[in-house]
Curated annotation (Swiss-Prot):
The keyword Zinc applies. The lineage of its organism: Eukaryota, Metazoa, Chordata, Craniata, Vertebrata. One of its GO terms (biological process) is regulation of immune system process. CDD domains: KRAB_A-box. This is Zinc finger protein 2. Gene3D superfamilies: 6.10.140.140, Classic Zinc Finger (3.30.160.60). It comes from Pongo abelii (Sumatran orangutan).
Length: 425
């Protein structure tokens, strides 16, 4: 079996939470300003080290707050027992000459005493040396205390490999819905919100809700207009560095995430994950109204509009409304002018390439979409979907007047014309 490179293993297992160090309010109060500056330096360096490995790491709350100069997020004491921490996180602080007066040494000693013991304030934290023994302070001839920094002991300087205990750390928290595993309970809890739809973080400006605090933090920037990360090529700005990194690959053409099944490559891991569901058939997003499942959350969102009847995308020219922005874009091309895409076989023209591609299957006889129940094949996926309702008995389209349900949208439109005709008569 081929050896797995350290980078590959990191991409499969490491999250920022695995190498992050957080404090309670009481622990934070023991830190003097220079120690807090060191904490900021180490946390930002660890985060940047993981990002530099090509991992699609969303910007955590603590990093967002540190960059803004805010007080970093602290551990919730009531939930601290559920948090699984790395077993060998070194909390030795790198000594800087300016912090070694008597008061600072006392403050640092209190912090080290807190972090070195097993207590509810700091569970599972121990001070370790590289060989695994409990760390001790060494005195030089001048009496100065020398210590190792967190980033040095963890081997997380920029460009260095991640330590072995992180690479081999076991995932023991499993999602009961999809089987995906995580290092800790908090990561599992965040993941499970994709199944439950829970969004506990509300924007106080517009009321929009989010499943993750970091997503809310990025959204809040849209109200303030703050976009601190600008592209040097096109000047487009982004709310976080990871989004800028993905965007810059458009200019460089880099596609580091490749599908093992078909070889297709993508700019980011999320696009690869969505693509791989084509091969696996996974459909994790289920409609609570009709039970239909989808491979992408955006497709589920568009589908749910069928049940509500809401069409949020309206044409400015004629007022016609659509369920999806892609449908609106295709429609607006009709107002823009002559169709650009012409069929070489019959001369029929279309406003977009996808419509031309679908049309050309009439000439080629290509029917790639086959029903698994009866084997009947179709040239378009939407026609296969309508056909499968014959087998499932699904009738997702409801008449808003009488409540009668139908298997296709065209049937409900035809049915409603009867009411319109009766109204005219």
């Amino acid at each position: 079996m081929a050896a797995v490179s350290p980078t590959t293993r990191c991409q499969e297992s490491v999250t920022f939470e695995d190498v992050a160090v957080v404090f309670t309010d009481e622990e934070w109060s023991h830190l003097v300003p220079t120690q807090r500056d060191l904490y900021k330096e180490v946390m930002l360096e660890n985060y940047n080290s993981i990002v530099s490995l090509g991992l699609p790491v969303p910007q955590p709350d603590v990093i967002f707050q540190l960059k803004r100069g805010d007080k970093p997020w602290m551990v919730d004491l009531h939930g601290s027992e559920e948090r699984e921490w790395p077993e060998s996180v070194s909390l030795d602080w790198e000594t800087k000459p300016e912090i070694h007066d008597a008061s600072n040494e006392k403050s640092e000693g209190s912090l080290r005493e807190c972090l070195g013991r097993q207590s509810p304030l700091c569970p599972k934290f121990e001070v370790h040396t590289p060989d695994g023994r409990m760390g001790t302070e060494k005195q030089s001839s001048s009496g100065e205390t020398h210590k190792k920094s967190l980033s040095q002991d963890k081997g997380l300087r920029r460009g260095s490999a991640l330590p072995r205990e992180i690479l081999t750390k076991e995932r023991h928290q499993e999602c009961s819905d999809c089987g995906k595993t995580f290092f800790d309970h908090s990561s599992l809890t965040r993941h499970q919100r994709t199944h439950t739809g829970e969004k506990p973080y509300d924007c106080h400006e517009c009321g929009k809700a989010f499943s993750h605090r970091s997503s809310l933090s990025r959204h809040l920037m849209s109200h303030t207009g703050e976009s601190p990360y600008g592209c040097s090529v096109c000047a487009k700005a982004f709310f976080d560095r990871s989004s800028l990194t993905v965007h810059q690959r458009i200019h460089t053409g880099e596609k580091p995430f490749q599908c093992n099944e078909c070889g297709k490559a993508f700019f980011d891991r999320s696009s690869l994950t969505r693509h791989q569901r084509i091969h696996t058939g996974e459909s994790p997003y289920e409609c609570h109204q009709c039970g239909k499942a989808f491979s992408q959350k955006s497709i589920l969102t568009r589908h749910q509009l069928i049940h509500t009847g809401r069409k949020p995308y309206e044409c400015n020219e004629c007022g016609k409304a659509f369920y999806g922005v892609s449908s609106l874009n295709r429609h607006q091309k009709a107002h823009a002018g002559d169709p650009r895409y012409q069929c070489n076989e019959c001369g029929k023209a279309f406003f977009d390439r996808s419509s031309l591609t679908q049309h050309q299957k009439i000439h080629t006889g290509d029917k790639p979409y086959e029903c698994s129940e009866c084997g009947k094949a179709f040239s378009q996926r939407c026609r296969l979907t309508r056909h499968q309702r014959v087998h499932t008995g699904e009738k997702p389209f409801e008449c808003s007047v009488c409540g009668k349900v139908f298997s296709s949208k065209s049937s409900v439109i035809q049915h409603q014309r009867r009411y319109a005709k009766q109204g005219i008569d």
